Amino acid sequence: MSQVKRTPLYETHRALGAKMIPFGGWDMPVQYSGIIAEHNATREAAGLFDVSHMGEIFITGEPKIVLDFLELVTCNSVASLSDFQVQYNAILNENGGLVDDVTIYKFSAEKYMICSNASNYETVTAHLLKYLPASGVKVSDQSPNWHQIALQGPKANEIFSKFLGRELDSIKYYHFALLDYQGEEIIVSRTGYTGEDGFEIYSSIPFGLKLWSGLSEFGKPQGLLPCGLGARDTLRIEAKYPLYGHELNNQWTPIESGIGWIVKEKKNPYFSSGKILSQKKNGTEFKIVAFALTEAGVPRENFRVLDFQGNEIGKTTSGTFSPSLKKGIGLASIRTEKIKDGEPIQIEIREQPKQAIITTKPFIPGSIRKN
C-alpha cells in the first residue's frame, strides 16, 4: 500500500484546525471553519484553496511534432490555442475513454503544460510516454517541483491585484501570464473550478507557502476564507463541473460524460475520433445531466434514478446539499431519451423516491468574466 502524500501546506492546514481526509492518494483538508461558511465565502467574497496535489506535466520539442502528438491524444483542438491561452481538454485512451480531464497551457509552439488531476498525473504521464514519437518531443512530469493555490470568488480580482500591486484585467478568462513578484516568476491563470472569477497560481514550493500566508492575511478583511475539498465539491456541483471518478472515467467517452462541447473535428484522426464524432452526431444511450430535488433530501453518488413509472433510468454520479440554493442537487448518468429540461424524475434516497427535475441551465450565475 502506497504512503499517503502531503502537500507543502500540510502543517499550515493542521495549524488552522483543518479536518484532514485522504483524497486521490493525498492527505487533504476537507474543511476549516465549515463547508457552508467556506462555500458562501467563495460565492460572496473569496476562497483560498490548496491545489498543490494537482499534476504539472510539460510537453516540449519541435513545434509540428509536439502539436501532432497532442492532437492525437486529445479531443479538443490544441491547434486553435494562442500563446498564453488555456484550454479544457481530455486525454483519451484507445477506446475513447478518458485517461483524465485536463487543462492545457500553451507557452509557445515549443512548450505546453498539462495540469492533471491529483490521482491521475502519473497515469497521464505513463500514457503520454507510451505514445511518444521516436524523436522531437519530451514529456516531463514536474509535479513535485510546483506549488499551486487557487483564489476564487467575486472579490478575487480585487484582492489579488491589490496584493500584487498591479492590474490583472489584462489576463482574460482561460488565459495566463508569467508575472514577476518579489523576484520570483509565477504563473497566474484566470481559471478555476468553482463557477466564480478567480486565479490558479503556480510557483516554486517555498514561494507558494509565502503566497498562501500573505494572501490569507491580506484578503481576510474582505471576507476571504481558506477552503477545503468539501466546499470545492459543493461549488463545482453547483457549477455543473464534472469530477474524474464520478462523471468521468476510462470507459465513458467525452460525449457520454457530458463534456461533448470539447469534442472537435480535426485535420487528422485522434484516438477513437470516428466513434466519438459519430456519438456527437447521432447521440448515445446514456449521458450526464444535472438535476435538482423539488422536495427535501440530499442525493449522493450511486443512487438510483427513476422515471415516474418507477423504472430505473440511470444512477447519480455526484450529489450534495446546495448551500446557495438550499436544496439537494446533483449529476447523474441517465438514458438519453429521458433528457429534457424540466423533465420530472425521481431520485431514490434510502429506498424512498424523491421528486426532482432535470435542469440543463446553470444552477448559479457565478462571477466568471468571459472574454
Curated annotation (Swiss-Prot):
UniProt keyword Transferase present: yes
Recorded GO CC terms: cytosol; glycine cleavage complex
UniProt superkingdom: Bacteria
Keyword Translocase listed: no
Pfam families, per database record: GCV_T (PF01571), GCV_T_C (PF08669)
BP terms from Gene Ontology: glycine decarboxylation via glycine cleavage system
Keywords: Aminotransferase, Transferase
Catalytic activity as recorded in UniProt: N(6)-[(R)-S(8)-aminomethyldihydrolipoyl]-L-lysyl-[protein] + (6S)-5,6,7,8-tetrahydrofolate = N(6)-[(R)-dihydrolipoyl]-L-lysyl-[protein] + (6R)-5,10-methylene-5,6,7,8-tetrahydrofolate + NH4(+)
Molecular function (Gene Ontology), one example: transaminase activity
InterPro entries xrefs: GCS_T (IPR006223), GCS_T_bac (IPR022903), GCST_C (IPR013977), GCV_T_N (IPR006222), GcvT/YgfZ/DmdA (IPR028896), GcvT/YgfZ_C (IPR029043), TrmE/GcvT_dom1 (IPR027266)
UniProt EC number: 2.1.2.10
Role this protein plays: The glycine cleavage system catalyzes the degradation of glycine.
Self-association state and partner proteins as the record states: The glycine cleavage system is composed of four proteins: P, T, L and H.
Family membership noted in the UniProt record: Belongs to the GcvT family.
HAMAP family in UniProt: GcvT
Protein name in the entry: Aminomethyltransferase
Organism of origin: Leptospira borgpetersenii serovar Hardjo-bovis (strain L550)
